[in-house]
Amino acid sequence: MLKTIILGVIILIGAVIAAFILVGRERSWELIAGLPDRGPHDFDANRRSPTPNDALACSPGLCAKPDFEIAPVEEAPALAIERLSLRLIASDPLARRVDNRKDPAKARFVTYSPLMRFPDVIHLQARPLPDGRTGLMAYARAQLGTGDGGKNRERLEALFKTR
């Protein structure tokens, strides 16, 4: 009886793994948890994940309690977002832009962890500052799990080269 139960569990696990491989890792997570892109992040509302699986970076004064600050830039908002978008795509082959590009001062990307393809979303936004420079805001969040091991913060730090 015990052997039959163990064999049944092994077969079930094998079937789940085979389905995961056949359907594809990214699509499997999508079927389990829904689309990773849940729309734009509202930086003004400053809502964060209730679990430690996100990271927030902003130029001084643009958001409350960022994980780290990023310096304002001299470029116009649209150019700053375009530069950051190109840098992100160049550094992360799994990242793809998912926003409709109607607002050139905003961008949204979905990317995936290399091995298991866990989905993360990255939101970028730029705003003109009173001094003529452009302030930057970035929010990255894992769609699945309650922790990301600091990966989203690392991703933003690399994007803004703060290390």
Language model: regions and residue ranges:
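Acidic, proline/glycine-enriched N-terminal capping motif
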Residues: 13-14
